[in-house]
Curated annotation (Swiss-Prot):
Detected in brain, but not in the other tissues tested. Expression was highest in the olfactory bulb, cerebral cortex, hippocampus, habenula, basolateral amygdaloid nuclei and cerebellum. It holds the Pfam family Ion_trans. Potassium channel regulatory subunit that modulate the delayed rectifier voltage-gated potassium channel activity of KCNB1 and KCNB2 by altering their kinetics, expression levels, and shifting the half-inactivation potential to more polarized values. While it does not form functional channels on its own, it can form functional heterotetrameric channels with KCNB1 and KCNB2. Each regulatory subunit has unique regulatory properties that can lead to extensive inhibition, significant changes in kinetics, and/or substantial shifts in the voltage dependencies of the inactivation process. Belongs to the potassium channel family. S (TC 1.A.1.2) subfamily. Kv9.2/KCNS2 sub-subfamily. The chain crosses the membrane at residues 185-206, 226-248, 260-280, 291-311, 327-348, 389-417. It is a multi-pass membrane protein. SMART domains: BTB. This is Delayed-rectifier potassium channel regulatory subunit KCNS2. One of its GO terms (molecular function) is voltage-gated potassium channel activity. Disulfide bonds: none annotated. Residues 207-225, 281-290, 349-361, 382-388 are extracellular.
Amino acid sequence: MTRQSLWDVSDTDVEDGEIRINVGGFKRRLRSHTLLRFPETRLGRLLLCHSREAILELCDDYDDVQREFYFDRNPELFPYVLHFYHTGKLHVMAELCVFSFSQEIEYWGINEFFIDSCCSYSYHGRKVEPEQEKWDEQSDQESTTSSFDEILAFYNDASKFDGQPLGNFRRQLWLALDNPGYSVLSRVFSVLSILVVLGSIITMCLNSLPDFQIPDSQGNPGEDPRFEIVEHFGIAWFTFELVARFAVAPDFLKFFKNALNLIDLMSIVPFYITLVVNLVVESSPTLANLGRVAQVLRLMRIFRILKLARHSTGLRSLGATLKYSYKEVGLLLLYLSVGISIFSVVAYTIEKEENEGLATIPACWWWATVSMTTVGYGDVVPGTTAGKLTASACILAGILVVVLPITLIFNKFSHFYRRQKQLESAMRSCDFGDGMKEVPSVNLRDYYAHKVKSLMASLTNMSRSSPSELSLDDSLH
């Protein structure tokens, strides 16, 4: 194939080596050697075509007589393409849409690499900014959509009690158990639950003190009987909570898909497993090793602290923040991993002969981790001047690395906290019994959907407010 392959399809004299281009009515005559400077572009490949079929694959129409190639493209953008063929550089005017321009040069087979330096920074900045805004907007939209789904599911669950025996009574009991702050009864129940959780955690902590341990027949430390009474009362209360919520749940299958209910279940399962293991060990001494399993399960009591999430807006908001901020959290971990890897190797190279605590790279990982997170236990410290300078750089880098993603995560947290407060306020304001009496001729699902739409409007206005409106004191409640 030669550069004259195109001319073989026409009898017209081509000694001038020119072709005619018509782009949406914008006509120009171009010399072949100008186009062949860039053979990978659409017009450059057009000159190398040796059949009409190949030509029509690259343009929209072709006139054999006039040797005119027609392209159904935007004629206002083609002058920029034409300028590229003459100068080898692309320029982007400020009034142009960068995405339309990007699609246009992609059609002509021109790489963004040819954008001149005077326009490159502005072009790529304008192109990335909407994508970043779209990412943040999509993340907020997903979180807000989940709120709408959550409140709609709440109304749907409440409607399932209609027509059931004692339906209104069960609904009020369900609201009192599952929504702290819904009524006076729910507030009292919530306070009692919090006190029992805190009492159980405090008891577990005090039981680890030697002064409160009573040796058994074999001399092993055992629990104080008074603490066992508190523990058994706590288990009885937690079991009552779980059974009561399950008994009045509108959807039993959905009940076990709720993370808070799974936490309630996991808070009592270790106790009953431990009870069974102890009975088995007592009846069969050969299975004494199972006692270690019981000891491990007893340590799982600390997870009861998660039960407070049912009564704390801040904890639930934290959980939602971690769920929808996985990109920011991943970015934070990536930054820390890179910094730890670099500074641990540097510290190892400098201190391996002078400091036994930094004699291996894994040991330096620990040092770099506590330094970058600004914890600084002080168990391992560099001794040389170069090592101390490295430690200073590691700490400063850690501050910068941690602060940048934390700002994004806090903005997410403030958004979820305000949203959760709004949801709780909406749930507390619901009076299903009175509301249904006021609209006897309206379908219940339509009625609930109408309420959801009103809530959606308020949530949208709330999400547009500034994150700075949230005070640090409020986030702790």
